[in-house]
């Protein structure tokens, strides 16, 4: 029987983690995403066109305030924490909540989630949301194009 997984996130790393680890894994079933930080994202679906063949209806996105109810309702085995810009205190509070509700609390490491480039790569990262990664990426891409390089930008999907 497939492990039932819920992914917590903020419309970023959560979708990346899904695509790199769970999307094509028949031994897991991602039953839901939860989200916070992004206005009006709850009650939407991660689209079937991005979710892949195992998820023909896409995956529902719920407000994170429903986490405990969702763990129980969907008999979740593992909750994957997929934020990258929150405090240690917040992470551990969520871990306690998840485990008290009966699920495992999972943090995916870089070896499981990093893309494996076959060409020279530049990564634009930041310590929190909204600090200018997109603008910086455009500037770096422009400079590389001006230097005669072929440039491709890779970004996680947004529903």
Model-identified regions with their sequence ranges:
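A solvent-exposed beta-alpha-beta segment
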Residues: 2-76
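Walker A (P-loop) phosphate-binding motif
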Residues: 113-159
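Cofactor-binding loop segments of dinucleotide-utilizing enzymes, especially the Rossmann-like FAD-
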Residues: 10, 35-36, 110, 127, ...
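Conserved strand-to-helix beginnings and helix N-cap segments that scaffold or border functional pockets
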Residues: 19, 91-92, 137
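Phosphate-bearing ligand-interacting subdomains
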Residues: 48-111
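Hydrophobic anchor at the start of a short beta-strand
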Residues: 30-31, 105, 149-151
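Short glycine-rich anion-binding loops that position phosphate/pyrophosphate groups of nucleotides
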Residues: 13, 84-86, 129
